[in-house]
Amino acid sequence: MESISWNTPSVRDALAAVKRDAPFVYGLTNYVAANLSANVLLAVGAAPAIGAAADWPARFGAGANALWINTAALMSSGADTLLTAARAASKAGTRWVLDPVALGAGAPEYDAIVRDLLALRPTVIRGNASELIALAGGTAAGKGVDTTASPESALAFIGDLARRSGAVVAVSGPTDYVTDGVATLAVAGGDARLTRVTGAGCALGALIAALLAQRGAALAAASAAHAIYATAAERAADARGTASFAVRFVDELSLLDPAESSRDRSAGQIGAKRRE
């Protein structure tokens, strides 16, 4: 299995392309995560629009450079809103990310909507181990939005899900794994305090969408997003508390320089991380 990091040239190239092109990224996410998601996109140079104002799902689902749908958007939007955006994206060829938050946690009507979205062929599916095991048809029950399984235990499931859905599938944890059903890439690093920042995992879906907008290989885009996220978290690791870490994390995302030399600044210490 190949590992990638901030020092992988393709990762830096992916971020440079976002900074150069400022892709328009449309998102449907929950109100808890919307602010951080928008700030993450702005920090890397993307142009976000988030929410379900009149006509946005159909118009922006088709017209944005990329779309991401976090299914916890159902907290404030109806299922038709999410399905409209996904259908518009699929029809227009807009690449999109599905984040099936809390799938398998014991809400059958909610889970059915997620599966309806899956049928619309997302480009990338990202989530924690419990969510993705459940989406692949396995038995896994998360603790609300949090995982009770390790990413390693999900590897066989995400490979199968990728092959059946045609999507790249990414599971997050202390080490992230991203697969297209044939090749699997590993991304280590980050900081455990991402698990204490509301919406950190949701915002990762937004970042994946920004990199997908560049139209390169989806596997490379999704894995690069994880590596960029991990690096910013590592560089924020000396923040004193959780709130200062959250602010510093966005700062570090904005300061990442694709042209920097590996000698200019260490990519940080490898550590445990992330809202899984």
Curated annotation (Swiss-Prot):
HAMAP family: Thz_kinase. Substrate binds at residue 199. Transmembrane segments: none annotated. GO terms for molecular function: ATP binding; hydroxyethylthiazole kinase activity; magnesium ion binding. It is an enzyme of class 2 (transferase). Catalyzes the phosphorylation of the hydroxyl group of 4-methyl-5-beta-hydroxyethylthiazole (THZ). GO terms for biological process: thiamine biosynthetic process; thiamine diphosphate biosynthetic process. Belongs to the Thz kinase family. Pathway: Cofactor biosynthesis; thiamine diphosphate biosynthesis; 4-methyl-5-(2-phosphoethyl)-thiazole from 5-(2-hydroxyethyl)-4-methylthiazole: step 1/1. Its EC number is 2.7.1.50. It catalyses: 5-(2-hydroxyethyl)-4-methylthiazole + ATP = 4-methyl-5-(2-phosphooxyethyl)-thiazole + ADP + H(+). Disulfide bonds: none annotated. Its cofactor is Mg(2+). The gene is thiM. SUPFAM superfamilies: Ribokinase-like. This is Hydroxyethylthiazole kinase. It holds the Pfam family HK. Keywords: ATP-binding, Kinase, Magnesium, Metal-binding, Nucleotide-binding, Thiamine biosynthesis, Transferase. It comes from Burkholderia pseudomallei (strain K96243). InterPro entries: Hyethyz_kinase, Ribokinase-like. The keyword Nucleus does not apply. ATP binds at residues 126, 172.
